[in-house]
Amino acid sequence: MPTLLDLMYQKRVFLLLVFANLFIQLSISYYVMIYTKKSPIGHWYLLGIQIIIIIVLALAPIPSFAKFILFSIFSYTFGLSLVEYKEIVDERAIEIAVKGTLSLFGLMMGVGISLILGGIRLGQRFGSFLFWSLLLLIILQIIAIVGDGLSMLHKVLTFVGIILFSMYIVYDTQQILSRDYAGDFISASMAYYLDIVNLFVNLIVDN
């Protein structure tokens, strides 16, 4: 079994592309969020566009350049989705959420790497656990949104969301380092992107 250093050396170009694309996409979302006063597209329309793009990226056999364009559109629409949070939180809270997100990302990525060094690999069973946990979280969040007097449940779910997406960073770090993506750096960086932006949203709501 190759060591961590062997894995990183073998995948050095792939990892460089993953983090370069991740930086570009996060920058798009952040720029749109900061410099857009009001989203020209409704929340549910944005969500619909994002779901369609995720399905296409996951299932359609399209070249990397086309995936990059679709990912960039997704990042743009997600940035528009984040604009509404500027109306309920101040700039200081957003700044704290950004720093908290980056700190947690670095910490949990380090945990994922440390587990590999310790010979611990998080397999498909752990990935399934995260998926079903996320599905349950989404259902409970919908209940909290439509229900009256469930503010405490909403706070608890926000805390659970922070923990869950932190665990996703650990899992995705191991997947990116050990799984053969066949050069598909877009999908790998999308996994990190979704972890980071969802962690960011939960931290904003928590503030």
Regions found by a protein language model. Give the residues of each.
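A hydrophobic alpha-helical transmembrane-helix feature that marks the membrane cores
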Residues: 1-207
